[in-house]
Curated annotation (Swiss-Prot):
The keyword Protein biosynthesis does not apply. Highly expressed in melanin-producing cells. Colocalizes with melanin biosynthesis marker dct. It is a multi-pass membrane protein. InterPro entries: K/Na/Ca-exchanger (IPR004481), NaCa_Exmemb (IPR004837), NCX_ion-bd_dom_sf (IPR044880). Belongs to the Ca(2+):cation antiporter (CaCA) (TC 2.A.19) family. SLC24A subfamily. GO terms for biological process: calcium ion transmembrane transport; developmental pigmentation; intracellular calcium ion homeostasis; melanocyte differentiation; melanocyte migration; pigmentation. The chain crosses the membrane at residues 79-99, 124-144, 149-169, 182-202, 208-228, 316-336, 351-371, 382-402, 421-441, 451-471, 483-503. The gene is slc24a5. This is Sodium/potassium/calcium exchanger 5. GO terms for cellular component: melanosome; membrane; trans-Golgi network. Residues 36-78, 145-148, 203-207, 337-350, 403-420, 472-482 are extracellular. It comes from the Eukaryota. It is found in: Golgi apparatus, trans-Golgi network membrane; Melanosome.
Length: 513
């Protein structure tokens, strides 16, 4: 048991370090593109565009959306910024601990009790929990800051969710994952409809009560489709499988079948194979006294689960254990561990409390990253495309990579696309509450400048992702990861050139300039 826990912690550490390295690579490339764009903007051929800067509408800097730091600018430049870097690392570690120790196990128990397949679980509960920071951001934007921070944050990180997280899953997975056509098609269509609805709603810079109700209705229809996903998928496969090879059922020996391990009363280990087309991959079978398909692998939920206060044997692991002990203790006393038999019936409370802590840690993470970017003079354009987008989506990134590394590719992809669909609810719910219960009859004012480019990019990225998966043979591997990474770098390059006014003739400047 101790060896399993150490291996699990090592996997979490490897995933976290790999994600950080990938984000630093993206940040370096995007920053180089920005510097090159500034050089071109200063040339004689681009000076005419700079004359339009005074007439263009300014945007608030990212730092205006958060409280001031606990150091002055000069104190941060004199060395105080190291404290912020340590807080950033600790928040990343905290998010990974919540996801690994509480959030994903609660998702496992929920899926087991409700009989959900991998893709449905990833598109609903996993997407809702990992997108909790966006929901908090949307409520802050409507009720606290009275601005469009929710729109800018959700729309700005949407392309990152689609392309960058998919790239991370493909590049950091140890094995090739097989993808199913129907779940990806279902989620991509739902997200395309959601994006089109948001663009139509905010085109006049005002959101009324029926606009928020429309978004809630779209998400309600999406959830209803998920509830009847088995029947719908069977109909689609029977209707279109003769003309579409990707919808044809795979052989029973393929990787689509998940091994379910159960321990009977005589403690003998038995293995049963069940296709994804069955009613659920987590349902109990007669003759099994204990059944678990762990999101971290085929792990038994033991009565003697490893305590967070047990010290590791090696010195390096002891250092990491001491560093993570405060947050581990905080989570231990505030979140019930549904892996333990006593708390297993409180899995929904575990899920909700995990989402709360994920939101809190992510907010502090993005706050610290924003201050670091402001101190180092990193432009908001580069920050928004890399570190801030990654910060708000770090729960999705960690959760998706973890389940992808265990061979659950459909769950990872459904979480990637499904979390973006849930983000539409993040916009519709606070808008509906504001216009119906708070300021009755008064619309919510939003700023839709520049969203035409963003909306076109979102729709194109959805189409590109689906086509890339199809061309790659419905495999989640390093080739798909490289293609998605290159596409995201291209998107970031075009976005930077657009905001600088090099393309589009519409430079965007900060109000602090």
């Amino acid at each position: 048991m101790r060896t399993d826990v150490f291996l699990q912690r090592r996997k979490r550490r490897d995933v976290l370090l790999s994600i950080i390295a990938l984000l630093l690579l993206i940040f370096a490339i995007v920053h180089l593109v920005f510097c090159a764009g500034l050089s071109f903007q200063g040339s004689s051929s681009a000076r005419v565009r700079r004359d339009l800067e005074n007439a263009s509408e300014c945007v608030q800097p990212q730092s205006s959306e958060f409280p001031e730091g606990f150091f002055t600018v000069q104190e941060r430049k004199d060395g105080g910024i190291l404290i912020y870097f340590m807080i950033i690392f600790y928040m990343l570690l905290s998010v990974s601990i919540v996801c690994d120790e509480y959030f994903l196990p609660s998702l496992e128990v929920i899926s087991e009790r409700l009989g959900l397949s991998q893709d449905v679980a990833g598109a609903t509960f996993m997407a809702a929990g990992s997108s909790a920071p966006e929901l908090v951001t949307a409520f802050l934007g409507v009720f606290v800051t009275k601005g469009d921070i929710g729109v800018s944050t959700i729309m700005g990180s949407a392309v990152y969710n689609l392309l960058c997280i998919c790239a991370a899953c493909g590049l950091l997975s140890s094995a090739v994952g097989r993808l199913s056509c129907w779940p990806l098609f279902r989620d991509c269509v739902a997200y395309a409809i959601s994006v089109a609805a948001v663009i139509a709603i905010i085109s006049d810079n005002r959101v009324y009560w029926y606009d928020g109700a429309c978004l809630l209705l779209v998400y309600g229809v999406y959830v209803a489709v998920l509830c009847f996903d088995l029947r719908i998928s069977e109909y689609v496969m029977q209707r279109f499988s003769p003309c579409c090879w990707c919808l044809k059922p795979r052989d029973r020996d393929s990787g689509e079948q998940q091994p379910l391990v159960g321990w009977s009363d005589d403690s003998s280990l038995r293995v049963q194979r069940r296709s994804r087309n069955d009613s659920g991959i987590f349902q109990d079978d007669s003759g099994y006294s204990h059944l678990s398909l762990s999101l971290h692998g085929l792990n038994e939920i033991s009565d003697e689960h490893k305590s967070v206060f047990s010290m590791p044997d090696h010195d390096l692991k002891r250092i990491l254990w001491v560093l993570s002990l405060p947050v581990s203790t905080l989570l231990f006393v505030s979140v019930p561990d549904c892996r333990r038999p006593f708390w297993k019936n409180f899995y929904m409370l575990t899920f909700l409390m995990s989402a709360v802590w994920i939101s809190a840690f992510t907010y502090v993470l993005v706050w610290m990253v924003t201050i670091v970017g402001e101190t180092l003079g990193i432009p908001d354009t580069v920050m928004g495309m890399t570190l801030l987008a990654a910060g708000t989506s770090i729960p999705d990134t960690v959760a998706s990579v973890m389940v992808a590394r265990e061979g659950k590719s459909d769950m990872a992809m459904s979480n990637i696309v499904g979390s973006n669909v849930f983000d539409m609810l993040c916009l519709g719910l606070p808008w509906f509450i504001q216009t119906v219960f708070v300021d009755v009859g008064s619309p919510v004012e939003v700023n839709s400048s520049g969203l035409v480019f963003m909306s076109c990019t979102l729709l194109l990225s959805i189409i590109f992702l689906f086509l890339a998966v199809h061309i790659n043979g419905w495999k989640l591997d390093w080739k798909l990861g490289l293609v998605c990474l290159a596409c995201y770098i291209l998107f970031a390059t075009l976005s930077i050139l657009y905001e600088l006014g090099i393309i589009g003739n519409n430079p965007i400047r900060s109000c602090s300039d």
